Amino acid sequence: MSAEEAMHAREEHEARADRLSAPHRERKARGEKHPIEDFLHTYYPFSPGQLRRWHPGWQVGYEASADQAHSGVGDVDSDGCRRWYSDMQLQSGGASGAVRAADLERFARERGDAAYWIHRLLSNSSFAEKPGNFSCFGLHEWAMVYRLGPGEKRHESLPLRLSAEETNRVVEENRLVCSHIDAFRFFTPQAAPLNASRPTRESQPMRDDPACLHVGMDLYKWSMKLAPLLPSDIALDCFEHALDLRILDMEASPYDCRGYGYGIVPIETEEGKREYVRRQRLLADRSDALRTRILAAVEPLVPLFAKSSRPCAS
């Protein structure tokens, strides 16, 4: 890419990223919190500044002079060099300049094991590898409040839709089949033994389910961890998708989110279960399309990652 093309692509990416993070940044400046939307900024370890970093993807090089105006900002240091990138001097028609591209050798050396683990995880959790489980009905959020006492809920700013006794009964009268470690680990001690399995970090690559809302949300995390290898528009697409997943996650939860402008999916009823599955299927298809894009982007690099691979829990 020419410097002009790269700068234009960067500006477009930054503008889109800023639009996506603006509500969170504005709330933070006011000292306010949002129990639904802030999740993507507080649970996942990526700042709005990281989200706005533009990457063309490992297969694209661009004129390094495009970064001059960003010296000392983000991942560009004061000398104009960029972290996780390397420069190659080219000469053409008497003119010379540096072309900047992702530093594959360094990435493989320092992060190849994590990338290999992520590739394995995403490959195993695709619809091409396994059918999705559409019978969990979002009960993980209910298991996280099961038999808790007053003041012990994760989201104290949100009231429960049902009484504590009724909420507990929903857990007891349904089957907990959560397969995702990062949902299961928040189950209350009383709820964990009720789950059909005991997910672990070690078993995650085999257990993650393509229909799981949290597995879909995690695509945002994996796309960010694979920077600068992926085109950064994939990360923004994953972020937007994660917000849609989060909305269903909370609308189907025991919490009453109507005070924040959201609805209710009453999974304690048969009608609510049907609505949850209908929306879950649509979101799972979108998750799988994003997963496919990530895998396609890094597939040629897997042999490079494999050389440095060792057991890794990312």
Walk through the language-model features, giving the residues of each.
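Active-site acidic/histidine clusters and adjacent loop/turn architecture
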Residues: M1-S123, Y260-A313
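Alpha-helix initiation/capping motif
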Residues: S47, R161-S163, P231, T269
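Generic alpha-helix signal with a bias toward terminal, lower-confidence helices
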Residues: R52, W58, A66, Y146-G151, ...
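A contiguous catalytic/ligand-binding core that recognizes phosphate-bearing ligands
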Residues: R100-S203
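Charged/polar positions within long, soluble alpha-helices
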Residues: Y146, M224, M250, P254, ...
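Short, Lys/Arg-enriched charge-dense amphipathic segments
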Residues: E152-A164, S253-I264, R274-L283
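An amphipathic alpha-helical core segment
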Residues: C178-E275
